[in-house]
A protein has these predicted regions:
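Active-site entrance/lid segments in N-terminal catalytic domains of soluble metabolic enzymes
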Residues: 1-171
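Gly/Ser-rich catalytic serine loop of serine hydrolases
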Residues: 20, 175-180
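Conserved active-site-proximal phosphate/metal-binding subdomains
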Residues: 154-170, 179-236
Length: 236
């Protein structure tokens, strides 16, 4: 992947967001071949052997190094995630073009991924976490805004993007209720480079979601959304 021009070479400015339980190697490959950035979380592979197999499948299909189509892997860098060190070792073995960090300081990942020429994006929910990621040397910030699925944010993209652009000149990605061309154009008008789109891909044939869940997603509306702090979240 050409780090300097990969965004311009995309068919649409979208990262297919990594979703727990849902995203897999098949979805990554299909997304990247369709002209966007496919990604998946390492935690979806319950064993290191399964993660190694997924990496092997993806690199065989999408290529390696500068000849690779754009794709990424998401790793939890929280100290509570016991497997992060082993996951990083496999990342260094297969060298995905983009590594997305979540729920912790990305510094150790940045240093190692930059050694092989990869890009590191960090997902953030506020300016405090944005500054920590910037100080760690990330190449891009994923602004997880109000309306994002999973570990959601509270800020409106109208406020978040403009404030981040004052302190960061790298790649800006925005997530949160983006599911159409109109919403992609809206975040581009704000100054974002890429859309972080997840829910739209749950109902694809490649995803690991059950058929019943896919049907529920297709038929759901805003009234079904529940926001809770009772399961997991982001420390301050």
């Amino acid at each position: 992947m050409d780090n300097n021009n990969f965004i311009h070479n995309l068919r649409l400015p979208i990262i297919q967001a990594p979703m727990f339980i849902v995203s897999n190697a098949r979805l990554v490959i299909a997304s990247s071949r369709a002209g966007i950035v496919g990604s998946f979380p390492t935690a979806n592979c319950r064993t290191l052997e399964a993660l190694d197999q997924s990496f092997s499948e993806i690199t065989s299909a999408l290529g390696n190094g500068k000849n690779s189509l754009p794709w990424g892997v998401n790793i939890i860098v929280s100290k509570m995630y016991a497997r992060s060190g082993d996951d990083i070792e496999l990342i260094l073995k297969y060298r995905p073009p983009i590594v997305i960090t979540s729920l912790g300081n990305p510094k150790q990942v940045v240093e190692k991924v930059h050694e092989y020429g990869g890009l590191v994006f960090s997902d953030v929910i506020n300016l405090y976490h944005s500054q920590k990621a910037i100080d760690a040397g990330v190449d891009g910030l994923i602004l997880v805004c109000n309306g994002a699925g999973g570990h959601t944010g509270d800020l409106s993209p109208f406020a978040f993007v403009s404030e981040v652009k004052e302190i960061f000149d790298g790649i800006i990605i925005v997530g949160g209720s983006i599911s159409s061309g109109e919403s992609i154009l809206a975040i581009q008008a704000l100054g974002a480079d890429l859309a972080y789109m997840g829910t739209r891909f749950i109902a694809t044939k490649e995803s690991d979601a059950s058929d019943e869940f896919k049907e529920m997603i297709i038929n759901a509306s805003a009234k079904e959304i529940i926001k809770s702090n009772k399961i997991t979240g982001v420390n301050g």
